[in-house]
Structures are given as structure tokens and as C-alpha cells.
């Protein structure tokens, strides 16, 4: 099981829920539950979207575009790291200025989305926890210890919300796990396939994991 971001949360969920069936686990830029600082991010982007009067408590007749664009601008400070912006890495994505990047990349990423779909995703993300079920009854460390898969946990060193510190804590409680950070300044989006160097690191790690006995 593998996945990025919320896909990583899902991968952890499969490995904990079906420990006898998942033989390899490789979550990247994601954790086994949503930790408090991550929840702070979600509360902020939710508020940005819902502040648009056009959202109308979810009963909108047209997309709340102002709220969607504002959400994108708020997210811009979280998705990539400080050194990403300092070193102007956005130019590698075809944007000449910071302003162009914020509007062209971040705003336009969210404008096509349905607002209520995004809010449903945020709720799922905020409440993610592999131990919140009848099997583990909230015992998070027991849920982690139950994972039998050969595991490689790949946080991004500069991820601002699925932090490497949270991932390292989780890795220590998984019996057969290796902590292997993605050493990148592309923040959370190092796992999104935008930077070839980061993508190659992930691909090579997956190949190594699948090749082990």
C-alpha cells in the first residue's frame, strides 16, 4: 500500500486494518493520523472558503469563487517550504514572479473544485486516525504496532503540516519500519510529482521496497 498526503493516510489505514494482507507499506508526505498543527491548517482553509457570502452555508447557486481563490492564497504559505520561495523555485514551474505563482498556480488549482466536495475532504482529513475504530478503540500506538508490513515512511524534510517529526514518532512504533525522509525544499508538494529529483527518490525507494524479501 502506498500513497501521498491523504493517500498516505489511507495506506496506513489499510496496513493497520488488514495487517495480514498488506506486505509492503510506503506512505509518503502523510501520517497515520492528523496531528494538532495539521488541524490548525485545515481550520484556516475551511474558514477562508466559508467566509465567502456566496457559499451560503453550502446552499450556493453558483461556485463561491472568491472563497475558493482565498483558500488557494492561504494554502500557498503551507504547500511549499520557506526555502522553496526564497530560492524562487516556482520559476521552474513556469512562473516569473511570486504574484503570478500565487494567482496562477494556487488560486487556479482550487477554482475548478466544488466547495462542498472540498469541505467533505477537509472533514475526512481532519478526523483521520487509524486507531479510531472498533478494532483499536483509539489506542494509536497499538494500531501502529499492529502493522506487519515491511515499511518505509517517507516524510518530506520541509513539509509544514505532515511534519517529519510526527512521522518519525509513528515510525518508531511500527515494528518493521524504516524512516527515510525526502530531503527536499519543495515542502509537502515534493510528493506531487512536480520536481523530477523528488519523484525519482520516491520511485527508487518503492523499487527497493518491492525488491526486498
Which stretches of residues belong to each language-model region?
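Conserved alpha/beta-hydrolase "acid-adjacent" motif
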Residues: 136, 160-166
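Short beta-strand/loop motif that positions the catalytic acidic residue
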Residues: 147, 153-155
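Short beta-strand immediately N-terminal to the catalytic nucleophile in serine-hydrolase-like folds
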Residues: 1-3, 28
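Conserved alpha/beta-hydrolase "nucleophile elbow" surrounding the catalytic nucleophile
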Residues: 3-4, 156
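Alpha/beta-hydrolase-fold enzymes
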Residues: 21-108
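Active-site nucleophile elbow and catalytic-triad environment of alpha/beta-hydrolase enzymes
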Residues: 104, 120-143
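Short glycine-enriched nucleophile-adjacent loop
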Residues: 8-19, 25
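Catalytic active-site module of serine/aspartate enzymes centered on a nucleophile-bearing elbow/loop
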Residues: 168-172, 176-213
Amino acid at each position: 500500500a502506498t500513497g501521498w498526503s491523504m493517500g498516505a493516510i489511507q495506506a496506513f489505514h489499510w496496513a493497520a486494518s488488514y495487517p495480514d494482507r498488506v506486505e509492503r507499506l510506503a506512505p509518503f508526505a502523510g501520517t497515520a493520523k492528523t496531528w494538532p498543527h495539521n488541524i490548525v491548517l485545515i481550520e484556516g482553509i475551511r474558514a477562508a472558503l466559508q467566509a465567502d457570502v456566496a457559499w451560503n452555508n453550502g446552499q450556493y447557486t453558483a461556485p463561491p469563487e472568491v472563497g475558493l481563490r482565498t483558500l488557494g492564497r492561504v494554502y500557498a504559505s503551507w504547500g511549499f517550504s520557506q526555502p522553496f520561495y526564497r530560492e524562487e523555485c516556482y520559476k521552474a514551474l513556469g512562473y516569473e514572479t511570486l504574484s503570478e505563482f500565487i494567482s496562477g498556480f494556487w488560486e487556479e488549482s482550487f477554482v475548478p473544485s466544488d466547495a462542498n466536495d472540498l469541505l467533505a475532504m477537509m472533514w475526512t482529513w481532519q478526523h483521520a486516525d487509524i486507531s479510531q475504530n472498533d478494532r483499536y478503540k483509539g489506542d494509536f500506538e497499538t494500531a501502529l504496532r499492529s502493522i506487519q508490513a515491511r515499511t518505509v515512511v517517507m516524510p518530506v524534510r520541509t513539509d509544514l503540516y505532515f511534519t517529519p517529526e510526527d512521522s518519525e514518532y509513528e515510525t518508531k512504533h511500527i515494528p518493521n519500519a524504516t524512516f527515510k525522509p525526502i530531503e527536499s525544499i519543495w515542502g509537502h508538494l515534493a510528493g506531487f510529482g512536480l520536481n523530477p529529483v523528488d519523484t525519482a527518490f520516491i520511485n527508487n525507494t518503492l523499487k527497493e521496497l518491492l525488491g526486498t524479501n
